[in-house]
Amino acid sequence: MAAKEIIFSDVARAKLTEGVNILANAVKVTLGPKGRNVVLERSFGAPVVTKDGVSVAKEIELADKLQNIGAQLVKEVASRTSDAAGDGTTTATVLAQAIVREGQKYVAAGLNPLDLKRGIDKAVAAAVDELKKISRPTTTSKEIAQVATISANGEESIGQRIAEAIDRVGKEGVITVEDGKSLADELDVVEGLQFDRGYLSPYFINNPDKQIAEIESPYILLHDKKISNIRDLLPVLEQVAKSGRPLLIIAEDVEGEALATLVVNNIRGILKTVAVKAPGFGDRRKALLEDIAILTGGQVIAEETGLTLEKATLAELGQAKRIEVGKENTTVIDGAGDAKNIEARVKQIRVQIDEATSDYDREKLQERVAKLAGGVAVIKVGGATEIEVKEKKDRVDDALHATRAAVEEGIVPGGGVALIRVRQAIRELQGVNADQNAGIKIVLRALEEPLRQIVTNAGEEASVVVAKVAEGSGNFGYNAQTGVYGDLVESGVLDPTKVTRTALQNAASVAGLLLTTDATVFEAPKDAAPTAAPGGPGAGGPGFDF
């Protein structure tokens, strides 16, 4: 086991905070409509230019191990927020930095870190409740476009494209983003279906940038049982290999020898395959497999239909123009199924919806209709150079996630105003002791920070703007794009409630953990002897605990 170094108390927290600040300072310059770009070096190929907070955070690794631990903690804030809401990563980072900075002052003054954390948690819970009260649902295509525009750093064309895509495929439809071949953005809607199962092995990935497996013009094998014996699969694999096309296998499970053989053949380029588990469970799984079969023009290989794997031929396999398989989702684009059969299937499911007695069953049936009838919208991002397209794609992805979040939990005034308004709800909040009250004050100050940073990035004086916005009420705020005060909802500056809520909760969670840290253990440099660094129990000296 490698030797470890241990750093204690104030020394540890100070170093961790330095790491937090280095990462947060790099990320927060991207916040708001006038946020700046960050250039990321690549070990091969052109550098990447981005305004996406989580992309910047993921690139940062610091040489100082203790600073790096602090940076990684804030990186976790951005990653968690990205995973949960798809946007708001920069806001979450700014909030985390503010909570750590304000909290450190109180910890250094001798207040109890655990009570500070309890006060922070209490204030955040009250702030989230208030956010939900001021939130309202998105009702129009215009509002969806406005949310997308704000998330795309004020680019209206992106907002309009996403709103149009949602209009075409519905709120339950699937929208994907691709590189375009022209200077302008384009929107294509193709018939398709997405289900919540991903690849069974990461070795199937052939697009490392997106961490997905993409296959063009594949055959699709549908089976309702587990596949573990490769001999059962050999006849159909040989037929597919002769055709020169890839294969997607959707089965209850693919394991053991069968999965290992598919992976090896894939790596060697003998037969490009991807294996995923069938969606759903029990009877619902059978119904979903049948949906996929009808959409792709194939048949489910099942005992009930008298078909077996050993005797399966290409005629029983479905086909599609393209398949995208991620860690958690599979999208079938432009299946080769007959339009009349698909329409008949949709009608059949609609009858089941009318007859359904439980809300859960009705909801799941409606999802199936949306997937069969809605199709997949593909936004093709245009640009003059590959670097421009990649940067724009990041913003389209963020905007897409933001609109999904807005549909899910509603919207609040944007531009950092919603967080200023929730301060009024927690201003009178009291903890059980003075230290908890200090924790509440930390959150009160941190809630100003996103607005301060947006204004700073726009080149204005933050304190003046924050004071004026705080004097107002409701939707009154500062539009950093135009430099004008007014009703932000009317001027289309909106944020999804889910994004704002998730950013605040994740920032408080990780910042609270960092404030309550009193020792840090990390691997000692190879050329240094293991030591307990100054500041440990019993180590005298100014500024350290005794």
From Swiss-Prot:
Spell out the reaction equation it catalyses.
ATP + H2O + a folded polypeptide = ADP + phosphate + an unfolded polypeptide
Q: Where does ATP bind?
A: 30-33, 51, 87-91, 415, 495
Q: CDD domains under this entry?
A: GroEL
Kindly list the GO molecular function terms attached to this UniProt entry: ATP binding; ATP-dependent protein folding chaperone; isomerase activity; unfolded protein binding
Instruction: Give a single Pfam family match.
Output: Cpn60_TCP1
Leader sequence range is none
Keyword field contains Ribonucleoprotein: no
Keywords per UniProt: ATP-binding, Chaperone, Cytoplasm, Isomerase, Nucleotide-binding
Gly residues bias (residue ranges)? 535-546
Decide whether keyword Chaperone is in the record: yes
Q: A GO BP term, please?
A: protein refolding
* Enzyme Commission number, as recorded: 5.6.1.7
Q: Which InterPro entries does this UniProt record tie to the protein?
A: Chaperonin_Cpn60_CS, Cpn60/GroEL, Cpn60/GroEL/TCP-1, GroEL-like_apical_dom_sf, GROEL-like_equatorial_sf, TCP-1-like_intermed_sf
Q: How does it assemble?
A: Forms a cylinder of 14 subunits composed of two heptameric rings stacked back-to-back. Interacts with the co-chaperonin GroES.
- What job does this protein perform? Together with its co-chaperonin GroES, plays an essential role in assisting protein folding. The GroEL-GroES system forms a nano-cage that allows encapsulation of the non-native substrate proteins and provides a physical environment optimized to promote and accelerate protein folding.
Name assigned to this protein: Chaperonin GroEL 1
- Identify the species of origin: Burkholderia lata (strain ATCC 17760 / DSM 23089 / LMG 22485 / NCIMB 9086 / R18194 / 383)
